[in-house]
């Protein structure tokens, strides 16, 4: 991947031996945006898990814009896509001043199960999305996503998320938002 750092224009590289072992690398704002939006909105009626940091300076607002993030949350709700969000305990406290209350309301309005984790589970701004058929490791601010489809890798990552469920505190999204707005 370091060999790709000099590339600034949007690009997609696919490295694969067969369908089960493909790796797709997306570089640049447009490629990252297209890949993440496609992955999140093409799985109607499915469930995904996301490990999501509370870094307010990340590329989400730069690449997508707050309005488009709210539209994405609405699309997830309308397509009945269920998100299992693993987020830091201070998620809303960090992001509401930056993205606004309406953004937070759109976040909890979608079909969402929230698991809170201590901040030390988020040492970087990299994030991870997992669907039944692929895992996506991404760093929006770094303008890169890596998509993995190997079954053994997916099983390992899904097992990690199952473990996180036993460690995390499951909260009601609406109650969590109300509590965060009071702070």
What is the predicted role of each segment?
Residues 22-24, 146-183:
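Signature of lipid phosphatidyltransferase scaffolds
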Residues 3, 7, 35-42, 75, ...:
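Residues that form generic nucleotide/phosphate-binding pockets
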Residues 1-22:
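Short, charged amphipathic alpha-helical surface segments
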Residues 16-24, 104-114, 183:
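Short charge-dense sequence patches
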Residues 29-153:
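Hydrophobic protein-protein interaction segments
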Residues 1-7, 80, 86, 179-183:
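Intrinsic structural disorder
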Residues 9-12, 44-47, 169-173:
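Residue-level signal for secondary-structure boundary elements
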